[in-house]
């Protein structure tokens, strides 16, 4: 298969490097990723300034690689329009440093890059790896990504489908398996810390994660040692309440 790789941690991150090294064993890959870290950029795009595209090299990676001065969504958009000389079969975003569970999905540049691919009718997978006590296992996540690409190909994955995948911080042999599940109820209780320095006042976002989830969710199963897979789409319409809202007017 012909795959486009992207991420939000930047073109020089270990996550995308490990992913590329694993997937190039069986696939043709092209990399288009942000020149710097673009975490939590969600689906933002650049509209008021030009994007700069620079071809770079990654050691031991057999792929044409582009460093782009934009967001993860920018990278996919500009790759589709200006970089790719022929279509790709799938877009893989990641491997993200840290999970994208529950409401994280809405803030995630990793997931949004995958959703941008779906907007272009290209199937995509967003890969994220758990960080636990400062440790992360990119090798496990990359191996899982390779398996999922094969499974997706065998099942003719649709172009408007995104798989949000989160891999526990475990060796592959210790994983309990794959679990398809829904988003969990995860919120970020935020507050801003006031900082006064050099006669200037600034505010730094702080806070804690609060998990309010059912035993059918990505958060629950990841904690149990499963790789979680949540199918996503970009239509945010709340169909359950549409008729009720129609009756308001």
UniProtKB/Swiss-Prot annotation:
Taxonomic superkingdom: Bacteria
Enzyme class: hydrolase
Cofactor binding, note field: Binds 1 divalent metal cation per subunit.
Function: Nucleotidase that shows phosphatase activity on nucleoside 5'-monophosphates.
NCBIfam families the record matches: PRK13933.1, surE
Family: Belongs to the SurE nucleotidase family.
Protein name per UniProt: 5'-nucleotidase SurE
Originating organism: Clostridium tetani (strain Massachusetts / E88)
Gene name of the encoded protein: surE
């Amino acid at each position: 298969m012909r795959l486009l790789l992207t991420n939000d941690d930047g073109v020089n991150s270990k996550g995308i490097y490990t992913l590329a090294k694993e997937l190039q064993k069986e696939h043709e890959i092209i990399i288009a990723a942000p020149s710097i870290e673009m975490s939590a950029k969600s689906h933002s795009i650049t509209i008021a300034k030009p994007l700069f595209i620079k071809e770079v090299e990654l050691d031991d990676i057999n792929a044409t690689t582009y460093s782009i001065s934009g967001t993860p969504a920018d990278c996919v958009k500009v790759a589709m329009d200006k970089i790719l000389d022929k279509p790709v079969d799938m877009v893989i975003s990641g491997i993200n440093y840290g999970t994208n569970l529950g409401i994280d999905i809405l803030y995630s540049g990793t997931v949004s890059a995958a959703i941008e691919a779906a907007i272009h009718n290209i199937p995509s997978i967003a890969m994220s790896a758990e960080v636990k006590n400062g440790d992360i296992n990119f090798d496990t996540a990359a191996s899982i990504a390779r398996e999922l690409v094969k499974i997706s190909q065998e099942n003719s994955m649709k172009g408007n489908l995104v798989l949000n995948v989160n891999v526990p911080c475990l060796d592959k042999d210790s994983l309990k398996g794959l679990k398809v599940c829904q988003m969990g109820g995860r919120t970020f209780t935020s507050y801003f810390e006031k900082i006064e320095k050099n006669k200037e006042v600034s505010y730094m976002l702080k806070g804690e994660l609060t998990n309010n989830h059912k035993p059918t969710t990505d958060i629950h199963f990841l904690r149990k040692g499963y790789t979680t897979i949540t199918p996503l789409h970009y239509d945010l319409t709340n169909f359950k309440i549409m008729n009720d809202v129609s009756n308001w007017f």
